[in-house]
Amino acid sequence: MSYARITAMSGDVPIVSHLYFPSFLDDNIPNERMTGIAMGLELMDMCDEVYVFGFDITEGMKFELDHAKETRKPVRLYDTDFNPVNVKTIPVDERADARYKGIIRNLKVLK
C-alpha cells in the first residue's frame, strides 16, 4: 500500500507533489523541474505538517526538509512500515545512518 493511501486512510489529506506535477511538467527540462520544486514548497507551506517515510532521504527530500526546518513546519517521522520513529532513540537506531541523523537534526518533530 502506498504511503499516500495509508495517510488518506488515517484521516489526513496527502499532498504528493512529486506524483502530481510530472503529469503536466517535464522533469527532464530544468526550468520545468525548478518550477515544480518551487510549487512543491508553496504547497508545503499550506500544509499543517510533513510526513517522512523511511530512512532513505533523496536530495529532493533533503531540500524539502531543509525548507521545513527553516519554516519550523512540524514533521512526523515513520519507518517504511508506517511505524512512528522515536526522535529520542534515533542516535542508537541502526536504521538511521549519519546522513539521516544530520538531515533530521533541528527539525520540529512531532510525536
Where do the language-model regions lie?
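Conserved catalytic or regulatory cores that recognize and/or transform ribose-phosphate-containing ligands
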Residues: 1-111
